[in-house]
Regions:
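Structural scaffold elements adjacent to functional motifs in cytosolic proteins
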Residues: 1-3
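Rhodanese-like catalytic fold shared by cysteine-dependent sulfurtransferases
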Residues: 7-42, 46-86
Length: 86
């Protein structure tokens, strides 16, 4: 899971073990953080628009299974799934 929100959003609550790469840095940092392009990569933001942009960049970079967490962190929290604060 790759969280593409800004640092303050990520710190306020994120999915356990999610990697943090702000959307503006995704093209540069994704290949450093997720080296295996065959594995699924799930992008998350607040509601999905930034994740969708990250998914498009990942496809351009050759990732085979980039996905978007539908509804983003709002949907995750609304489903009472665990959130970690840092």
């Amino acid at each position: 899971v790759v969280d593409v929100r800004e640092a303050e959003e990520y710190a306020a609550g994120h999915i356990t073990n999610a990697k943090h790469i702000p959307l503006a840095q995704i093209e540069e940092r994704l290949p450093q953080v997720v080296k295996n392009k065959k594995l699924p990569v799930i992008f998350v933001c607040a509601t999905s628009p930034r994740s969708t942009r990250a998914q498009m960049v990942a496809k351009k970079l050759g990732y085979e299974q980039p996905e978007v967490l539908a509804g983003g962190m709002r949907a995750w929290a609304a489903a009472s799934l665990p959130v970690v604060k840092s």
